[in-house]
């Protein structure tokens, strides 16, 4: 559905050119929810605006539904953009227009008749749960409801792609969950491809199928969300995952284990479980089979896209050969095992 090929974006700066994007290549499948995450200044918003050419990249190609947008003239690009809806952190609603009229605006600009507008807007208001608020003005509704108006407006032209640029960043946690549930519903019912730009790993965890991690304008890691959580490779990814699932041991735990490490018998590991392994007694089986003592230092159980995910930090005590055999057994059962050598 979306192919980004070698995108680079340079802007003039006070001390020379600023490289906002550096050779970014991504493939986003039709009908998936794809997340792009990164810290402030990583290039996320520049990238999402390159997808619909609000920012024309300095080099590279943007292909949407088989069409190279970078090769289109102004008229053809304007038509192609109707296939791409967009929602923002700030709702950009017209205060003088009602909820209904804000959603109808792009259809009015496209020259649609009142009957055509009504046949599109009314089902959209039903979809986003705003039918009863159709005659209210933006000042009379909540932030979450304003974002629902923004979503309905973005869908009015019946796009194939929806771009979300930090659309939940200004919302409280409960409203954020409701908006994310709505986006999942839209993705499921309309088959819409959604690209989520966010700095919140919690958003990625809740709704995205795959994710790309952006740092200094480059993609440093990408893959299925569950795989990235299980095996984060880049330090930026590990730090951002740590915001929602603790990866580092608490200081109080470090103090307890500090005196025992280095004796050759005590080893600290991080174990990650997913799917069926969360419910299976694989750790107990490893203890029984290899005669080890295990001490659970820290743990967390969560859910990623409806799939159970667990993380444990343990201290294994025993002969080194037995400890390694136990870890090999856990890996054979699908558990991700990482020895924490820098614990102190």
From Swiss-Prot:
ATP binds at residues 38-45. The keyword Protein transport does not apply. The keyword Cell inner membrane applies. Its EC number is 7.4.2.11. Belongs to the ABC transporter superfamily. Methionine importer (TC 3.A.1.24) family. The lineage of its organism: Bacteria, Pseudomonadati, Pseudomonadota, Betaproteobacteria, Burkholderiales. SMART domains: AAA (SM00382), NIL (SM00930). It is a peripheral membrane protein. GO terms for cellular component: plasma membrane. It is an enzyme of class 7 (translocase). It is found in: Cell inner membrane. It catalyses: L-methionine(out) + ATP + H2O = L-methionine(in) + ADP + phosphate + H(+); D-methionine(out) + ATP + H2O = D-methionine(in) + ADP + phosphate + H(+). Pfam families: ABC_tran (PF00005), NIL (PF09383). This is Methionine import ATP-binding protein MetN. One of its GO terms (molecular function) is ATP hydrolysis activity. Part of the ABC transporter complex MetNIQ involved in methionine import. Responsible for energy coupling to the transport system. It comes from Cupriavidus metallidurans (strain ATCC 43123 / DSM 2839 / NBRC 102507 / CH34). Residues 2-241 form the ABC transporter domain. Keywords: Amino-acid transport, ATP-binding, Cell inner membrane, Cell membrane, Membrane, Nucleotide-binding, Translocase, Transport. InterPro entries: AAA+_ATPase, ABC_transporter-like_ATP-bd, ABC_transporter-like_CS, ACT-like_dom_sf, MetN_ABC, MetN_ABC_transporter-like, NIL_domain, P-loop_NTPase. CDD domains: ABC_MetN_methionine_transporter. Coiled coil: none annotated. The complex is composed of two ATP-binding proteins (MetN), two transmembrane proteins (MetI) and a solute-binding protein (MetQ). Its main location: membrane.
């Amino acid at each position: 559905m979306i192919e980004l090929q070698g995108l680079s974006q340079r802007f003039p700066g006070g001390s020379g050119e600023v490289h906002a994007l550096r050779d970014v290549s991504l493939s986003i499948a039709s009908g998936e929810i794809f997340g792009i995450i990164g810290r402030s200044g990583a290039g996320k918003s520049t990238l999402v605006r390159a997808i619909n050419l609000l920012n024309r990249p300095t080099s590279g190609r943007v292909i949407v539904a088989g069409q190279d947008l970078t090769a289109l003239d102004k008229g053809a690009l304007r038509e192609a953009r109707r296939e791409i809806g967009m929602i923002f952190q700030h709702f950009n609603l017209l205060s003088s227009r009602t909820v209904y009229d804000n959603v109808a605006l792009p259809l009015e600009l496209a020259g649609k008749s009142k009957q055509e507008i009504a046949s599109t807007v009314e089902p959209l208001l039903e979809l986003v749960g705003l039918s009863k608020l159709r005659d209210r003005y933006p000042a009379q509704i909540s932030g979450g409801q304003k974002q629902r108006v923004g979503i309905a407006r973005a869908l009015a032209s019946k796009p194939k792609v929806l771009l979300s640029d930090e659309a939940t960043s200004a919302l409280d946690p409960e409203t954020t969950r409701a908006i994310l549930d709505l986006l999942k519903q839209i993705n499921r019912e309309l088959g819409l491809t959604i690209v989520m730009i966010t700095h919140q790993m919690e958003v990625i965890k809740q709704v995205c199928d795959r994710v790309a991690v952006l740092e200094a304008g480059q993609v440093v890691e990408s893959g299925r969300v569950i795989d990235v959580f299980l095996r984060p490779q880049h330090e930026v990814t590990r730090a951002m995952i740590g915001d929602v699932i603790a990866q580092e041991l608490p200081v109080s735990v470090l103090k307890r284990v500090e005196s025992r490490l280095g004796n050759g018998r005590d080893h600290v590991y991080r174990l990650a479980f997913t799917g069926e392994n969360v419910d299976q007694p694989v750790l107990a089986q490893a203890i029984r089979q290899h005669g080890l003592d295990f001490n659970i230092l820290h743990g967390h159980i969560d859910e990623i896209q409806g799939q159970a995910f667990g993380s444990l930090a343990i201290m294994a005590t025993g002969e080194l050969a037995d400890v390694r055999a136990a870890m090999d057994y856990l890996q054979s059962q699908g558990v991700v095992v990482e020895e924490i050598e820098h614990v102190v």
